[in-house]
Amino acid sequence: MGGHYMKSVLFVGHGSRDPEGNDREFISTMKHDWDASILVETCFLEFERPNVSQGIDTCVAKGAQDVVVIPIMLLPAGHSKIHIPAAIDEAKEKYPHVNFVYGRPIGVHEEALEILKTRLQESGENLETPAEDTAVIVLGRGGSDPDANSDLYKITRLLWEKTNYKIVETSFMGVTAPLIDEGVERCLKLGAKKVVILPYFLFTGVLIKRLEEMVKQYKMQHENIEFKLAGYFGFHPKLQTILKERAEEGLEGEVKMNCDTCQYRLGIMEHIDHHHHHDHDHDHDHGHHHHDHHHDHHEDKVGELK
């Protein structure tokens, strides 16, 4: 095989149709400050090359025996739970001699909260003594995965704990409720005279541009209310700290998986078949059966990394 790389880390960015939303530049900075014996490669889920399979091919071609795949995604959702594991499953068949470890997305992390606090401060907010009638809306993309949606609520709650705002609400840009219009209405009903919207997005892309237009509309609709759009989460230096931590967990074989993650991949087929009723209780034999079936790249490979 040649090459002195035995271990590699493959970062998976989302990719974007919008060149301004491109995470390529940030991802290339992730290649610095590593142990020289570790190969660091990058790839993208969609819109850009290399894709995940090509990224894995590159790692193996350069001699990697262990490939740790890290999703650069804020919350665990469809892409991180289904699409990337599917590419890893294919790679395991193609390269039976290589160990694959799948790391965690950014998720609920102390440094992520620090980044959100920084974005609020940059917008001119005083987190220690905010005005009583100032509300903050933590705004996510929104999706069909309850795990990701509820994680955003947890992040909102932790932000409330770590600041002195009386009103901190959660809203989504699409797919699920409460949508941002509802979030704004709720803040106003609670007596807010100022509403700060804090986007929990990794990169600009089309959503931020749409959001800027929406904020203009809110200002026109509610002339006596101050609306402020804080900077989006973005590629902050602290994000590198989180991603490095996720990579190190993978390299050391200490990936802490969320069990819901496994159940979700099984449940997706039920959703498609319309068998996903509200009276289900996520019975555990589903989850564990699923562990054996799909997530063997956690179970049998993690322990082998030395």
Curated annotation (Swiss-Prot):
Residue numbers spanned by region Disordered: 276-306
GO molecular function terms listed in the Swiss-Prot or TrEMBL record: 4 iron, 4 sulfur cluster binding; metal ion binding; sirohydrochlorin cobaltochelatase activity
Lyase in keyword set: yes
Name the UniProt record assigns to this protein: Sirohydrochlorin cobaltochelatase
Cofactor stoichiometry and binding remark: Binds 1 [4Fe-4S] cluster per dimer.
Enzyme class: lyase
Protein residues bound to Co(2+): H14, H79
BP-aspect Gene Ontology terms: cobalamin biosynthetic process
Cofactor(s) this protein requires: [4Fe-4S] cluster
Biased composition (Basic and acidic residues): 297-306
Residues reported to bind [4Fe-4S] cluster: C259, C262
Pfam families cross-referenced by the UniProt entry: CbiX
UniProt key word 4Fe-4S: yes
Organism: Priestia megaterium (Bacillus megaterium)
Protein role: Chelates cobalt to the cobalamin precursor as part of the anaerobic pathway to cobalamin biosynthesis.
Subunit-structure text: Homodimer.
Keywords: 4Fe-4S, Cobalamin biosynthesis, Cobalt, Iron, Iron-sulfur, Lyase, Metal-binding
Family: Belongs to the CbiX family. CbiXL subfamily.
Annotated pathway: Cofactor biosynthesis; adenosylcobalamin biosynthesis; cob(II)yrinate a,c-diamide from sirohydrochlorin (anaerobic route): step 1/10
Enzyme Commission no: 4.99.1.3
Highest taxon of the lineage: Bacteria
Catalysis performed (reactions): Co-sirohydrochlorin + 2 H(+) = sirohydrochlorin + Co(2+)
